[in-house]
Amino acid sequence: MTGVAIEAHGLGRTYGRRSGGRRALHDCSFRLPAGRVCALVGPNGAGKSTLLNLAAGLDRPSAGSLTVLGSTAPGDVRDRIAFVSQDKPLYPQLTVADTLWAGAELNPGRWDRATADRIAGPLERGARVRTLSGGQRTRLALALALGKRPELMLLDEPMADLDPLARHELMGVLMAETAEHGTTIVMSSHILTELEGACDYLLLVDGGRIRLGGEAEDIVSAHALLTGRAQDLSPHTVVESRTTGRQLTALVRKEGPVDTAAWSVTEPSLEELLLAHLRSPDAPPLLTPSASVVAGAVVGAAREEVASA
């Protein structure tokens, strides 16, 4: 799959009354190329779930535009999207077998029974959903999502209630899905160490805005960890710094060559970089070329503020 999976221009979502409502997203502009595995990270309340709901066509923007799989109305391409929300709303009275049957009936022409059965694997087919553990419900929800053979898969904290072995197994399945079918995956998570090995794209949301966006490798390589006794960090942009005795350690966004005579230079891990940006909300945003959109080029008619739910 080639092209752009998701593109946002000035995207905003406000809940409540116009004057005193809560802004979940504000002026978000970014692009996600198709076929990527994107980590959507940020603190609680940052706007991650709101962004996923908008992309799934379950909510409408209050401002700006959002294009998903080429459509400015994500609900119109819902048959090409799979969404696993945090609460995994399955029918509790149905059995596992009934649930898989319903998935096939609701997705005629797209359903991949072999994949759904493989993901549901160890689940007892006669067990009712209400008797399943949290991790088992997650497995069943992912079986429905992957069985649909979506072009875009949206996952909201999908691995939180899985044990480490199941988490590793299902993460491998997601990676294989992308490699084989070019599926675009957007996955929100707080498990930063797992995202580093699984995701090749990154969107950091904080305060309802996109703080970082682009290829994970490009974002990491744009930064450096500097350690030394020197105090002048110019011309680099300081994200975070700390002093221990006479030694200064700083995470910087590089603005030209680093003076290796004055500084010991190492590349930060993705986890170190994300944590530093989360601790430093005033650090300027960074979108790499693959994530940037042309200022003012709005796809479709720009939405004005509308009455919010």
Stretches found by the model and what they are:
Residues 153-154, 232-235, 255-260:
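Short, surface-exposed beta-strand/loop "edge" segments at domain boundaries and coil↔beta transitions
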Residues 17, 34, 230, 254-256, ...:
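Non-catalytic surface loops within mature trypsin-like serine protease
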Residues 2, 239-309:
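C-terminal coupling/interaction segments
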